[in-house]
Amino acid sequence: MSVAGGSISTAAGNAGKNNALPMAQLADGWLELESDPGLFTLLLEDFGCHDVQVEEVYDLQKPIESPYGFIFLFRWIEERRARRKIVETTAEIFVKDEEAISSIFFAQQVVPNSCATHALLSVLLNCNENNLQLGETLGRLKAHTKGMSPENKGLAIGNTPELACAHNSHAMPQARRRLERTGAGVASCRFTGEAFHFVSFVPINGQLFELDGLKPYPMNHGCWEEHEDWTDKFRRVMAERLGIATGEQDIRFNLMAVVPDRRIAITHKLKMLRTNQAIVSGTLQKLLKADEQGERDEQQRPDTPTTLLEPSAFTARDLQSLLKNLDTEIAINEQHLADENDRRQMFKVDASRRTHNYDKFICTFLSMLAHQGVLGELVSQHLLPSKKIANRLNRQTNAATAAANAANTNVAGTNAAGSKSQQQQQQTQQQPQQTQTAKNGKSPGKTPGRRRKGRNKCRKRK
């Protein structure tokens, strides 16, 4: 605890000295952040770590180049079967040895709404310092918390104003209002019945660790095979975790990778390509000049100490083809670098839109419209199209119903007309027969025997 207090005084002293930290922003505590790779990338820059970026992972099977770690966002429900099943599964892999715990950076989340920063720090502060430049703030935090307990490390994170200010600067205005409604002591990712929570997966000393600030201990998933990368082990663990945590039904989760800044690798590759381009271009010019002058002496051949290419092994046509390929590669990488710069710029634009509070503008704009007497008319115009659309849909529905009824009526009329036509045809066929019977002196439809029998009965009655 004393070391954590020292971290506060050191950071606060630097803040007061430089007047760079708006301490009033910390009055409301830590605010809730969205799960967005652009937001996390800019947050790392604000922490002082400029050589890292965060990318969203859409396909677990797709290879990822040199990741420092992964951040998994999932729906946290305190009392559900899947949660109990995960606890039962992960309890067996808890690392409870105090010496092993103190040798890594594992911090318990004791500050509400700080799980996003916890997840990033769990990845960065467990990386090899030779491969990653942490910056002044994170480097000081790592040095101060060395050997601390997980709880004190969590307190040290919450008591570092640089981290808190950077964290809150990326929160939406709705997060502050939500915090005011729920109370400053309620954590959206810890104490509510259903929320979202971040955990980190990092390789430490040849083993895959899962660091969750809401768990009492770090979790060791074991070593990976000699012939595979640590990401292969992570994929297997993640596939199993998704099946348990989501019950193969809930798809509300997010996976992000903390990777080196792509612009650094592209810039390094461009530098190498341009160097090779200059070497090949110079060699080609000297070779063409030698061909023109007819000088083929070995001592006069171009000297290329920085290339492994022997000028005598290539013709001018070969060098021209190689130069063309280099030009193509340079153009492709320049486009990639421009895309990455545009992407980083869009992160900043989205951050400005996300964090800007539009409430005052909207209220002022509506007040001006009401003062000018046009607000009611605009509202009516906005509502009128909706009514027109509803009426149009009703008319279309009624027309479709009437058309269907008319079609059914036509079908019934057609069937009746067909039956009447058949009856007329039958009557037409019977008329010649009746005419022939009349010619023979017999009444159609009457039996002669019955007629005589009836006459005899009449005579008897008389």
Swiss-Prot record:
It catalyses: Thiol-dependent hydrolysis of ester, thioester, amide, peptide and isopeptide bonds formed by the C-terminal Gly of ubiquitin (a 76-residue protein attached to proteins as an intracellular targeting signal). Residues 413-447 have a biased composition (Low complexity). Catalytic component of the polycomb repressive deubiquitinase (PR-DUB) complex, at least composed of caly/calypso, Asx and sba (MBD5/6 homolog). The PR-DUB complex associates with nucleosomes to mediate deubiquitination of histone H2AK118ub1 substrates; the association requires the positively charged C-terminal tail of caly, probably due to direct binding of DNA. Interacts (via ULD domain) with Asx (via DEUBAD domain); the interaction produces a stable heterodimer with a composite binding site for ubiquitin. Residues 29-260 form the UCH catalytic domain. The record marks 212 as: Important for enzyme activity. Its main location: nucleus. GO terms for molecular function: chromatin binding; cysteine-type deubiquitinase activity. The record marks 109 as: Transition state stabilizer. Residues 448-462 have a biased composition (Basic residues). The active site is at 115 (nucleophile), 197 (proton donor). Keywords: Chromatin regulator, Hydrolase, Nucleus, Protease, Thiol protease, Ubl conjugation pathway. GO terms for biological process: epigenetic regulation of gene expression; heterochromatin formation; protein deubiquitination; specification of segmental identity, abdomen; ubiquitin-dependent protein catabolic process. Residues 413-462 are annotated as: Disordered. The keyword Aminoacyl-tRNA synthetase does not apply. Its EC number is 3.4.19.12. This is Ubiquitin carboxyl-terminal hydrolase calypso. It holds the Pfam family UCH_C. Residues 387-462 are annotated as: Positively charged C-terminal tail required for binding nucleosomes. Catalytic component of the polycomb repressive deubiquitinase (PR-DUB) complex, a complex that specifically mediates deubiquitination of histone H2A monoubiquitinated at 'Lys-119' (H2AK118ub1). Mediates bisymmetric organization of the PR-DUB complex and is involved in association with nucleosomes to mediate deubiquitination. Does not deubiquitinate monoubiquitinated histone H2B. Required to maintain the transcriptionally repressive state of homeotic genes throughout development. The PR-DUB complex has weak or no activity toward 'Lys-48'- and 'Lys-63'-linked polyubiquitin chains. The keyword Phosphoprotein does not apply. Residues 357-385 form the ULD domain. Belongs to the peptidase C12 family. BAP1 subfamily. It is found in: Nucleus.
